[in-house]
Regions:
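Active-site acidic/histidine proton-transfer and metal-coordination neighborhood
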Residues: 1-60, 70, 178
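Aromatic/acidic polysaccharide-binding cleft in carbohydrate-active enzymes
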Residues: 144-147, 151
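Alpha-helical scaffolding segments of alpha/beta enzyme cores, especially the outer helices
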Residues: 2-13, 17, 45-49, 77, ...
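Active-site-proximal loop/turn and secondary-structure-junction residues that shape catalytic pockets
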Residues: 26-30, 65-67, 95, 147
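Hydrophobic faces of well-ordered beta-strands that scaffold small-molecule active sites
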Residues: 22-24, 59-63, 87-91, 139-144
Length: 181
């Protein structure tokens, strides 16, 4: 953590002075928290270490449920705990083939998890949006769909539009201004 403190302690100070925030994506990028290939910020244990080492509120997370599901972490419980540190959200989901996991385990070489476009995965996005709103999040959910094994290439835009409409329904539909405000 000394190198993290050295680098991100300085960057946090600059961000504070400029009025901006720094968000780490919760993706392992092929590594683990203690042997990262690219990204230290993929697990709650790492987040605790990072935010304790540099306690600035300008440091937070770019969060998406996909990376939690593929690690068998409950994204809803995690979001409830960390919502105050969520500064950006990716709309990316995952599907877990629990029948394959139960029969073959996770080291059989048989694929058991897929990154999915919102609306085609296992995440309850109504809960995600509710928790984000209750936690004061006012940002966007940026749909990340090219990973989807079905809605990619020539079907990517179809998946993106479906996800946009799905997420709008999950938030309660089209925005309607309160006439009493």
């Amino acid at each position: 953590m000394p190198r993290f403190v050295e680098v991100f302690g300085r960057l946090a100070k600059v961000a504070e002075d400029e009025g901006v925030r720094i968000a780490f994506e919760n993706c392992d990028m092929g590594g683990t928290w203690n042997r990262p290939k690219w990204n230290i910020a993929h697990s709650p244990r790492a987040w605790e270490m990072m935010f304790n080492a540099v306690p600035s509120q300008v440091l937070g997370l770019e969060w998406e449920p996909c990376h939690q599901l593929v690690s068998f972490v409950d994204p809803i419980a995690q979001l409830r705990k960390w919502v105050g540190r969520i500064y950006h959200v990716h709309g990316k989901d995952a599907s877990v083939a629990w029948d394959v996991v139960r029969e073959q385990g996770i080291r059989s070489g048989i694929n058991f998890v897929w990154h999915r476009t919102p609306g085609f995965g296992d995440t309850n996005w109504i809960d995600v949006i509710t928790i984000l709103r209750q936690g004061g999040f006012r940002g966007s959910i940026d749909i990340e769909g090219w990973h989807d094994p079905v809605y990619r290439d020539e079907l990517e835009m179809t998946g993106q539009v479906y996800a946009l409409n799905y997420l709008k329904r999950c938030r309660g539909g089209a925005f309607v201004a309160n006439p009493l405000s």
